[in-house]
Each structure stands twice: as C-alpha cells, then as structure tokens.
Amino acid sequence: MASKSHDLTHGPLVQQIILFSLPLMATNVLQVLFNMSDVAVVGQFAGPEALGSVGSTSILVSLFTGFLIGMGSGVNVVVARYIGARHDQDVHEAVHTSLILSLIVGVIIMALGFLFTPAMLSMLGTKPVLMAGAVSYLRIYCLGMPAMAVFNFGNAVLSAAGDTKKPLYFLSMAGVINILLNLFFVIVCHLAAAGVALASIISQYISAALVILSLRRSGSVVRLERSMLRIEPHKAKQVLSLSIPAGLQNAIFAIANLFIQAGVNSFDEVMVEGNAAAANADALVYDVMAAIYTACSSFMSQNYGAGKRKRIIHSYFISMAFSFGIALVMSALLVIFGRQFLSIFTNVEEVAQAGMIRLRIMGCSYAFSAFMDCTIAANRGLGKSFVPTVIVIMGSCVFRIIWVYTVFAYFHTIESLYLLYIVSWAITAAAEMICLRRVYREQMQKLPPDIDGVKAAA
C-alpha cells in the first residue's frame, strides 16, 4: 500500500509547522476547556467543598494521564520515523503493536488507580471534609483510562502521519457531550464531583471510538486492520523504549507534584481551593505549548527517517521560537486578566485572591518550561528518551522534593512553594540542551550528507 500520509520532509518549515500545530493546539485547548468545565460546573453549582474535592485529585489525575500521554509520544516518534523512511510494512506493524500496548497499559492504570485511590489521597493529606468527594471522583475517572489510552494512541498515529485535524473534530464532538452531561449530572441529578467524573469517562469512550473508527476507514498507511492486530516484538521494544521513559517522566513529574500538593494542603481550605482554581491555567498554557512539542518531535522524527539533517535542526529552532513566544503571550494575558479567569471557577473572593498568588508567580515561569520541554521533544524525536528522562527526574523532580523539604520548610509561605517551578525548569532546560547537543552530533553521524537542503521560511 502506498503511503498517503502528509509529507513533513519537504516544503517551507515555518508554514508547515504552523499548519501542523494549529489544529493540534485547538485540540489541546478544547481538551483543557472541557476539563475546566468539570471544575467550573462543580465550583458554580456544587460549591467550594466539591471544588476542593476535584482539585485535590488533580495531581493524581496528572500522574495517570501523564503516563498515557508519554505512551502516545513514543508511538508518535516510532510511526513518524517509519513514515519518513517510506517503510510501510514497518508502519503497519508499529501501529497495530502500539494499539495493543496502549490498551494494556490503560487497563493496568485503571485497575491500580481504582484500588489505591483512598490510600493515595490520604498520603497527600487530603482534608477529611474533601475526602469522600475526592475518592468518588477519582475512582469513576479511573474507569476511563483505557479509553484515554486508545485516544492518545490514535492521536499520536494521526499526528505522526501529519493529520492533526481529525483528533480536533473527534474531541469537539466528545467535548460538547461532556459539557452537556456535566450540567445534567450536577444540576439535575445533584451528583456533584461524581457527576463530572461520570460525564468525563462517557466522553472519553466516545472520542476513543471515533478515533478507532477513523483509523479503520483510513486509506493511508496507518489504516487499522483486524487481521494485523498482534504484538510484533521488535516494534514493541522500539515503542516501549521511548514510551516508558516518556511516560515515567510525566508520571514522576506528577509524583514530585504530590509533594507540592501536600505543601499546599498544609495551608487552609481557602488556599487549597484557590490553588485548585489557578492550577487550571497550567493545563491551558502547557497544552497549547504541547502542540509545538508534538510538532517538534514529529518533524524531527520524519526528517530523521528521511535523512534530512538540515530540516531536523531547523525544526527544533523554529519550534523553540514558537513555544517561547506562546508562553510569553499567554503568561501576560493570565497575569492581566487573572481575576476574570478565576471567576470561571469560583465566586468566592478569598479563593480568587489565593488563586492570584499562583497566577502571578507562574506567569513569570512558563517561558522557562518552553526551553525544557521543546528540547526534551527534540531528543525524543531523534530516538533518545532514557537520558533526557533521567535529567528530568533529577532536575525537576528530585530537585522539587528537596526544595519542599528545605526552602519551603524553612519559609513555609505559599510563594516559596510556587517559586520552585521556575528554578527547576531553568536547571533542567540547561541540562537538556547540553544533552541534545551531544545526541544531535551522534545521530547525524549515522546519516548521509543532506543533499536536499531546507527552506526555513514560508
């Protein structure tokens, strides 16, 4: 079968990266907005206690979903590289192997999350008044992990093939259903936190079904065929060698953030609820920037498979510039319009004041994460995931835990807790850039001279 996927190895890079990223950016923003609808509906119609219950689970939700997102990034790199190399049979094997692996991981996370929810929430020091709602929300949410795994798989495969529009369409449909169900379950059925969790998993299974149906009907090289559903050992090793470190990186970030959440929980309920409301900004900014990171790894991987060395490094620098610029603009907007943003989630003045503390500090921090995450994506696009993951673990995870037990323990102010983000991102970004320089040199030695050149502007 001839490949009908979008070619990322020819043409003006700036224009291509923009056109590739915009639908993915819209997809990520919609996903954040739909997730925010959970918090907004709970905060407005079920009260601050239910809002605090949902907010208390945010780190654990990030732990589970982060691992699945990491799985998807590994799938994306492997599939994109084979597409760039025009190895269609390898693409088929990688796609079908990845679907089975993703589903297995999703089921495992669902089971572990459901069983250990009370213990994990207790470890976080969740307030007793919030515990019942938090347990109910998280256990129901965990039932959607297999669907989330499948959607992330499909999103990764379609992005690797250069198609970032279909996931946007699917998520839009599922997201509208999610909002309607949120309102129904919370306002009509009075299910509070459990209601928004139930709405979330229903929409997740809808989006998973849509992406599988699309791949089944695809006429491209990434078409799903029931007869080919098997685990091919070599492809499984390739996918897992990238996916597990990426998933662990995201999960370990969440684990480090457990200590941060425990620090937040050491303050009163107003600060906990304000932090929960303001933390929605993190997801919004990160997920917009994540579209650029996906573009970076997809373009670098396809061009690495095609042997286009100039396009590889240019893809990195263009992606870095875009992600840094996006971070600056969004940070400024959040600082200026922070009160209006927080009013979506709470109408309690004290909670909004607590949330503004986080927004002001994080608004000065997001740009540093662009240097770190874009460089991690570049390393992954070149097929290297283990060492960048170790760097992240040490620079942004272990360092954060040390900060909590030293700097924060000494000052015990919420400002001293939030400042660890900017410091850890700066340290990790510097180390990741040093790593990329070495990885790039090593990987370029394996390629023939670039005979096609590159046009770096539209």
Q: Which sequence ranges carry the predicted segments?
A:
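Interfacial/gating helices of multi-pass transporter permease domains
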Residues: V42-S62, P128-G133, A193-A194, L198, ...
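Short alpha-helical transmembrane segments in multi-pass integral membrane proteins
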Residues: M1-S21, V79-P146, V188-I244, M300-S365, ...
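Short runs within selected transmembrane alpha-helices of multi-pass transporters and secretion channels
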Residues: G72, Y141-S159, P167-G175, V196-A209, ...
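N-terminal transmembrane alpha-helices
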Residues: L8-F45, I59-G74, V78, L103-M110, ...
